[in-house]
């Protein structure tokens, strides 16, 4: 199994930033720090063995308003590294003893993600073999042994009393060979048709293993997972590996279902868990959003909000051992959190990073302030990234065979209005572009394809933008456009 970090071992920090630049505009300091953190993982893997366990990740805390790219930076970094990644909100956790989710659950969820990720990779490795086995199962259904293309009814003409006594042994062998040869030729014809897709629309009845997930969900809230009990494995063993049920589907659907089943049988689940646990421990990334929401408790306690203050500070204290490095029991096994990279973020409007408890502050040694986005940034966000909004809408309408062209002046006007609305109402960063662009294209998206038929070309210029968004730009009461 490839090492979890091998996908980025050839990328220098500068190249990692260049990759992030394809999707995220600005915020160079934040990109630089996460690139260093990612490269340091590979450096640690190649450090002398006696020092490897001593080198801890430099956790990062990103400070900035909503919509400036904090989450996107972490998400793109995880995709680049092919690493298990989870985003959690600190405000959703509660102190141990209170009703709600405890902080350990983030590591359990991260491990589940890693298991699914590794399982998918293992299945891809055996995909060709799984498809072959699935095809054989479909052929067994299409031409079962008793109806394999040659009718044994032909034998019935000689089934009179005593006929078997007159058959020589050589004749019997020849008939068996002919029957086997005919069966194989018939099977090969059907196999060729199956591979060409000629039988895709034909309906067949297949046997599949029923999913025990619904039973898992019944027991989920009872804390079995917290005790490290793998319910899926438990019920699988008790039920003999899952109940079988019959389904009537097309051959095309059957191929997909049976390929998945065969791939599941071919992979080694113990190896999957072992690889997944290793990947979580060596390459996992946890993004803790809204960390500022639990920081404010240190002050509200003195201001009379004692209950809330204690609870928020309790979440910080529960978070501390996980960030420092501890063992968390999951249903897949024990996970050591020592080398998991934690990236925290928050707006820190009502509080500041120093409001976090000192021990937790010390576990996030790198602090990065992200800049507010201005009109120029919005213009670049609309046009430069590989997944830019303008490109997304172009692709959407391309599906209707309608060409949409954004003139440079039209995009500039969009950026100006988005920046103005952010300044006048509430700054929600790049998320404002979604609202403005959706409002601009609302009628267009509704009119396609009846009013605007396939083959049409639509041009978005500055005049159209001003005309359709004038009410947003001029009105001070913009509450209906706030996300």
Predicted regions and their residues:
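Non-catalytic accessory segments flanking P-loop/AAA+ NTPase cores
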Residues: 1-483
